[in-house]
Amino acid sequence: MYGYWSHFLCDVGAHEISRKRRYRQEKFLETTGYLFAFRNGLVEEIPTDVAEDTIIPYYVYNKGYMIGYAEDAKVYVKWPTDMKDWMKQKKRAADAHTKLTNYVKDFPKVKSFFGEIIWGVVGLGKVLRYPKTPKEFLWTVFLFPTRMAMWISLHYELKFKKREYSDGWRENLEVESTRTLD
């Protein structure tokens, strides 16, 4: 189920609803941290508490370069295999996006709680066409309250527990089930 959810969020959310549309409109678009490249010397410093796959393309885009989008690129990713790791990964990524305006005041918000709701409704046809089996349809339905729980939990941790997320390869933020096999 966690692999399906991860594929769904990438295929439908990141690519179908966001990146393809923004690329066609020649707007700023986020890259994926799983595969992106940029010309040496364009970025001097990368903050560790934000989404590097978003801040780096913004720096490049802000210098007048167009961000390319290779729709057919293939990347193999080991997704989380349990709820604890899935939540940890998603909360870390969501929080990293909330901090972007700390570095760039006019940052074009692409990923947010309200953005997920709005674009989920706008792209509802794509959302409902993605599942191929009844089991996948149920997993898709279960994803919505799980994402809501993730956002509520993140908000609670940030506002009331004063928890700060940072670079995922430090502290206890590494997602254990996504580590490669040795």
Tell what function each PLM region has.
Residues 27-28, 45, 75, 130, ...:
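Residue-level detector of alpha-helix boundaries and kinks
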Residues 34, 52-53, 141:
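Short, conserved alpha-helical segments within structured domains
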Residues 1-44, 87, 91-94:
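Long helical/loop segments within the catalytic core of UDP-sugar-dependent glycosyltransferases
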Residues 3, 13, 33, 41, ...:
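Residue-identity detector for glycine
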Residues 95-182:
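Terminal low-complexity segments of carbohydrate-biosynthetic enzymes
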Residues 21-28, 66-68, 98-102, 176-177:
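Short C-terminal domain-edge/linker segments immediately following a structured domain
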Residues 38, 43, 65, 69, ...:
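Broad hydrophobic/π-residue packing in well-ordered secondary structure
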Residues 1-5, 9-11, 47-111, 115:
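Catalytic donor/gating beta->alpha subdomain of glycosyltransferases that bind UDP-sugars
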